[in-house]
Amino acid sequence: MAAATGAGAGPGRTTDWQIATVESVHAESPRVKLFRLKLPAGQKFSAGQYYDIRLTAPDGYQAQRSYSISSSPEKPGVIELVIELIPGGEVSSYFHEAVVPGERIELRGPIGGHFTWTPNYIEPLLLVAGGSGIAPLMSIIRRRATLDSSPRMLFMFSVRTEHDILFRQELERMAHEDADFDLTITLTRAVPDSWTGETRRIDAQMIDTAFDAATGKTRLREAGTGTPEAAKAAPNPPGQPFGRAYICGGTGFVESIASYLLETGMDYDDIRTERFGP
């Protein structure tokens, strides 16, 4: 995904252009490939950061784009980039059509500080992604999964079709195994008969429903039982169940979600946003 409006220098940023080597290429969906790159000198990064990528043609012409890291920072020296094929996109087309393992890629980073998450922030997290906007959020999700004690998390993911659900098996496994990880996936276009999830764009009602479900699970655990009666007897959680939100996707998508979260009472500084485009 092309990244980050308003992101500046962040933890571990290297401002010089360097060379990374492509270790593997994996087709995650019909329009998205995952590229695993080995960084120079075991470079470290934080969950939520991105790298600038630069291509240089034989005649000296250069094209540059920014791509978010989807891998966990627990594995320094290696990053995974989510690159969606954009019609007419110079950099994404080159990666999809020409890049193979062993190729050397020019990059700069890691970049970004406002959109990062580190384990010292322990309040419940809301993550919302549209399409390939899942990339930096996947890094946060994976980092959280490495912890012995981790904050409650709700991840809401909007995609066009079932084929566009990136990292589906990994996400569904986490949701099944981790009682503190809630997952909502919604399809906005082609919906197969077998689909049992949401089928529209993420809106206020969907967010409220997801909030209620996540809050209800918390109340049941606090009561020490799984009965509705115990849930009613448990202390009511605050009206806004999440301490911080991370939203990544197209501009309209991000602004719509952020505006509604402000209406629910979430503080402006606790709503972290990242927009992308071609």
Predicted regions and their residues:
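Ferredoxin-reductase
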Residues: A2-E103, V159-T161, T186-A190
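Reductase modules of NAD(P)H-dependent flavoproteins
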Residues: R13-D16, M156-P278
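Short, conserved phosphate/pyrophosphate- and ester-handling motifs at nucleotide-, phospho-/glycolipid
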Residues: G48, G133, G250
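A short, basic/flexible loop-to-alpha-helix module at the beginning of a structural domain
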Residues: P110-Y121
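Conserved S-adenosyl-L-methionine
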Residues: I122-E123, R143-M153
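Structural motif
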Residues: P124-L126, L154, R244
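Histidine-anchored nucleotide/phosphate-binding helix
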Residues: I134-T146
